[in-house]
Amino acid sequence: MHRVKQKRNSVLVAVPILILCGWGALFLLSRWFAYDPARNLALSLPGMDGGPSGSDRAVTNEVQVNLAGKLEKFDGVPSSLPGSWPRFRGADFDNICKADVKLADRWPESGPKVLWSVTLGEGHAAPTVLNGCVYLFDYDEAKRADALRCFSLADGKEIWRRSYTLPAKRNHGLSRTIPAVTEDCIVTVGPRCHVSCVETATGNFRWGIDLQKEYGTTEPLWFTGQCPLIDNGLAILAPGGSDALMMAVDCKTGAVVWKTPNPKGWKMSHSSILPLTLHGEKMYVYAAVGGMTGVSPAGKVLWEIPWSASVIAPSPVPVAGNKIFITAGYGAGSLMVQIDKTADGFSAKEISRTGPQDWLACEQQTPILYDGLLYGIMPKDGGALKQQFVCYDPAGGEPVWSSGKTHRFGLGPFFMADGKFFILDDDGTLTMLAVSRTGYESLAQYKVLDGQDAWGPIALAGTRMLLRDSTRMVCLEMGAEK
């Protein structure tokens, strides 16, 4: 009798447990069927892979940075070789070399001749060239320092280096700007919004500005990409700060000559300032995060137009008929603006606003305008034309031509010289093609760099071409055989 009762009690205990287990299994099964595996996935963008957060980026606001730093001298000497590339996008701000140089139409099987190469800190900063010297704003990861480096164009030997200590975490590279150089001075903008001016011949320090500390600049995502402008002895900068959208600084003294108010709170973008003359008046055109504006040589806003792109890397491009074209990636597309002038002043009118699948758009590099046509590389979200090199008539409509599905490119640079386009792909493959109004005509292709993220703009001085990937710069001989 006791055994029967004990067995009955065991059954009474087991049944509820089995019922609970069954309900639990059904609950877990229902959760499994209801689970959306993509629900917690986030869009993966450059800089979101463990790079500095906003609070990390702001840490330098609490650190006193000695921008004078130190100057080191080496055994390199300036070259007597001809040619110059004095600033971002070249002498005329259009990424077209107009010097009378003859470049090879074909390359040997071994590719263009490598004259020299140097190791760099990880980044996308590109060189400028003047008087046989190559200037590049680098980041020394071992010493944790921004460094303006001067090399000989002849052999790549370092001549001098001006550096200052600055903590920074890798965020898809570090330095990514291009110095502006004149016979008198060099102006740089560092990844954390530090501006410096040094003497060109000696590297001696003149002055420096911490845009975050002094003007309330918000450091852009993935560090600063704005390249400085030197114009008539003034450094023209766009802090996008609390009280200075744009400003001019005397290169000799470091004195602020004028500041443009920023009542709308537009922020610094990766775009660079373009000096332009429209309707007979000079102005500085800049695409900030918030909108595009034209500012007079005295710092007065002449016109402005809102634009909601959140990440802007390309610079404005002037188009015939007093128009300006601006484009950006991450779905922003492009904007074409008409600038008019009456007795009451300037005005800006939107002509077209297009998505990346609708018309020409570029994510990282600035399109080239040549002979009335626009050339560029479509972004990944460019629809059927994604990552193709394309040619468009600024008047609108379908593309004049594209490189086709078998010729796609990444975020690397492209520029024009001697009737040819040169396109550097992400993996260091250099493509040369004929400049044409009728179609894509490839002339040669060779992998000239072994690294990755070859995004830094190309420079050409004489027949020597300077290119880089994320950690190495090479100098190639591109001249035609005589």
Predicted regions and their residues:
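Blade-level signature of beta-propeller repeat domains, shared across WD40, Kelch, NHL, RCC1
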Residues: 332-334, 428-429, 451-482
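Extracytoplasmic beta-rich repeat domains
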Residues: 115-128, 143-145, 161-180, 208-230, ...
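Loop/turn-rich, solvent-exposed surfaces of beta-rich toroidal or solenoidal domains
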Residues: 332, 358-435
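Aromatic (tryptophan-biased) beta-strands that constitute blades/sheets of beta-rich domains
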Residues: 5-16, 26-119, 135, 147-168, ...
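Residue position within the beta-strands of beta-propeller blades
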Residues: 134-136, 188, 237, 286, ...
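Short loop/turn segments immediately following the C-termini of beta-strands
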Residues: 90-93, 139-141, 191, 240-241, ...
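A short loop-to-beta-strand structural motif that recurs across blades of beta-propeller domains
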Residues: 147-149, 194-196, 245-247, 291-293, ...
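Short coil/turn segments that connect the beta-strands within blades of beta-propeller domains
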Residues: 131-132, 183-184, 232-233, 280-282, ...
